[in-house]
């Protein structure tokens, strides 16, 4: 290939500007490097054999012409696969040691080696980099006389060329300007490439930011949807809670009304107990109406109370149907007076005297019936809750049996009073007492056994007087006469129950 006569290019080696001149004449390559700052020069001549032997040693053989073309491409920077570098001997040895993996050798002591420079042609392939070193001995600074001669010869040549053809001068000037423009455009190209790389990076970053923003928007939309759903659920839950609050408030009002009715019932029972204690048996018509009204209110309160058991409601209903029409004072009446022991003892003695009188009258009547040949058998009595002991029915048992029966009744009553812990249980107990009385009133006394005494017959007038006396005292007037022992046991049991009930009420007053 025909090579140019010469080529001079300014090249930057490690930040220092150098002038590189290449001249190829036949099979000889002349290479000169000059430092623009210090004017130091390094020059070398290489024939084709040296170049080919150098490329063979590196492991990548190149012919002389190809090597010259590679050097020209590196100087003009027309190919990215070939570049140039200027190294000292020390730099070259360190490069060789790194390539071979050994330690760098000691620095040379020769000044000639230190002053020598090596122009390195670097050929970069896909997976390898080959270095072709060209040694350039130091030539020193140029001689001023020689430089002046060169300058004069160049001026003469320049004048001759200008005189020969002015058009060629213009062409050369244009070429020089074009070269400068090419250099400037090459630098601008490099700057634009760098700017393009930065723009691509920014575009990639912006795309990632947009994707992240889209994902955040989707997350926000999902959270807003969940928030609306939670608000809907919260509104429904609040509505249910408000309904529960209204229902509980209504139940509370019903419970308060039931409590007021129970308190009124308790006061009514206290008043009834006080009236029973005083021995009042006959009641006016107005009191009966009040009692019926109170009974209706209590039945309404029991119907609204959900905590009552069905068995207790049925028992209370049965007792309310069979309860006698006793007076019920107003719940807002005065407080029941406290228990008076002296009055209670006097009333008890009075009742005992009445019992003895009734017993004597019954014995007299039995003697009269026995004397007249009557059988003396009365109608049988059916008891729904308890069975009378034979000693209390026949009248043949002695006083010890009667007292034992009375004491057992008192003990059972006291044990029941001790188990009563609320007003509702006290209400059931008072109703059970009234029920037992009604059962006795509705039932028939047991048939008395004839008494082995005198057979004196009582008159009809005495029997009528005895019935009127029982009616005035509030007791049940039997259709047929029954045993005096049975009456005594019944009255004693009633007294014992009233006494135990009074003690229980006293304990309640003491607690309050």
Curated annotation (Swiss-Prot):
Residues covered by region (Disordered): 282-415, 430-472
Phosphothreonine modification, residue list: 282
Miscellaneous comment text of the record: The N-terminal 3D structure (head domain) resembles that of NHEJ1/XLF, PAXX, SASS6 and XRCC4.
Modified residues (N-acetylmethionine): 1
Gene name for this UniProt entry: Ccdc61
Predominant place of localization: cytoplasm
Any coiled-coil regions, as ranges: 176-203, 246-273
InterPro entries the UniProt entry points to: CCDC61_N
Phosphoserine modified-residue sites: 328, 330, 372, 375, 447, 473
GO molecular function (one): microtubule binding
Source taxonomy: Eukaryota, Metazoa, Chordata, Craniata, Vertebrata
Subunit structure: Forms homodimers (via head domain). Interacts with CEP170. Interacts with PCM1 and CEP131. Binds tubulin.
UniProt biased composition (Basic and acidic residues): 287-300
Compositionally biased intervals (Low complexity): 406-415
UniProt-recorded name of the protein: Centrosomal protein CCDC61
Reported function: Microtubule-binding centrosomal protein required for centriole cohesion, independently of the centrosome-associated protein/CEP250 and rootletin/CROCC linker. In interphase, required for anchoring microtubule at the mother centriole subdistal appendages and for centrosome positioning. During mitosis, may be involved in spindle assembly and chromatin alignment by regulating the organization of spindle microtubules into a symmetrical structure. Plays a non-essential role in ciliogenesis.
Subcellular location(s) per record: Cytoplasm, Cytoskeleton, Microtubule organizing center, Centrosome; Cytoplasm, Cytoskeleton, Microtubule organizing center, Centrosome, Centriolar satellite; Cytoplasm, Cytoskeleton, Cilium basal body
Family per record: Belongs to the CCDC61 family.
UniProt-listed GO biological process terms: cell projection organization; centriole assembly; mitotic spindle assembly
Cellular component annotations (GO), alphabetically ordered: centriolar satellite; centriolar subdistal appendage; centrosome; ciliary basal body; cytoplasm; microtubule organizing center
UniProt keyword annotations, A-Z: Acetylation, Cell projection, Cilium biogenesis/degradation, Coiled coil, Cytoplasm, Cytoskeleton, Phosphoprotein
Region of interest (Head domain), ranges: 1-142
UniProt domain comment: The coiled-coil domains are involved in microtubule-binding.
Keyword match Transit peptide: no
Keyword Phosphoprotein assigned: yes
């Amino acid at each position: 290939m025909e090579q140019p006569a010469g080529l001079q290019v300014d090249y930057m080696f490690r930040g220092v500007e150098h002038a590189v001149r290449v001249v190829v004449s036949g099979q000889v390559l002349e290479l000169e490097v000059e430092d623009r700052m210090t004017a130091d020069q390094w020059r070398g001549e290489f024939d084709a054999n040296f170049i080919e032997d150098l490329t063979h040693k590196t492991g990548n053989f190149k012919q002389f012409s190809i090597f010259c073309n590679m050097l020209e491409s590196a100087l003009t920077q027309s190919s990215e696969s070939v570049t140039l570098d200027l190294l000292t001997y020390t730099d070259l040895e360190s490069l060789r040691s790194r390539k071979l993996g050994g330690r760098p050798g000691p620095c040379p002591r020769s000044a000639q080696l230190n002053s020598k420079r090596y122009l390195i042609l670097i050929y970069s392939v896909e997976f390898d980099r080959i270095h072709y070193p060209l040694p350039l001995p130091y030539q020193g600074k140029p001689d001023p006389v020689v430089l002046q001669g060169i300058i004069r010869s160049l001026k003469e040549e320049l004048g001759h060329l200008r005189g020969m053809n002015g058009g060629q001068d213009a062409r050369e000037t244009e070429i020089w300007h074009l070269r400068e423009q090419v250099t400037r455009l090459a630098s601008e190209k490099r700057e634009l490439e760098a700017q393009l790389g930065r723009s691509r990076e920014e575009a990639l970053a912006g795309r990632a930011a947009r994707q992240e923003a889209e994902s955040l928007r989707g997350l926000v939309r999902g959270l807003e949807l969940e928030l609306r759903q939670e608000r809907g659920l919260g509104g429904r839950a609040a509505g249910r809670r408000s309904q529960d609050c209204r229902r509980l408030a209504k139940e509370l009002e019903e419970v308060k009304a039931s409590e007021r009715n129970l308190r009124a019932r308790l006061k009514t029972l206290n008043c009834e107990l006080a009236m029973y204690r005083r021995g009042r048996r006959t009641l006016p018509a107005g009191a009966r109406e009040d009692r019926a009204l109170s009974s209706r209110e209590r039945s309404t309160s029991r119907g609204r109370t959900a905590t009552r058991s069905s068995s207790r409601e049925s028992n209370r209903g049965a007792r309310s149907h069979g309860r006698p029409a006793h007076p019920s004072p107003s719940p807002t009446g005065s407080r029941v007076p406290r228990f008076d022991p002296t009055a209670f003892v006097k009333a008890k003695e009075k009742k005992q005297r009445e019992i003895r009188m009734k017993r004597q009258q019954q014995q007299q009547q039995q003697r009269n019936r026995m004397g007249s040949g009557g059988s003396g058998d009365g109608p049988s009595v059916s008891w729904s809750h308890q069975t009378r002991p034979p000693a209390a029915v026949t009248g043949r048992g002695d006083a010890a049996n009667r007292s034992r029966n009375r004491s057992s009744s008192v003990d059972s009553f006291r044990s029941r009073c001790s188990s009563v812990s609320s007003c509702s249980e006290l209400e059931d107990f008072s109703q059970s007492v009234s029920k037992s009385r009604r059962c006795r009133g509705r039932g028939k006394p047991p048939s008395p056994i004839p008494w082995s005494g005198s057979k004196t017959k009582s008159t009809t007038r005495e029997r009528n007087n005895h019935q009127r006396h029982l009616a005035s005292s509030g007791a049940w007037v039997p259709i047929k006469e029954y045993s005096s022992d049975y009456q005594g046991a019944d009255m004693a049991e009633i007294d014992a129950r009233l006494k135990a009930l009074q003690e229980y009420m006293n304990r309640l007053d003491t607690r309050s």
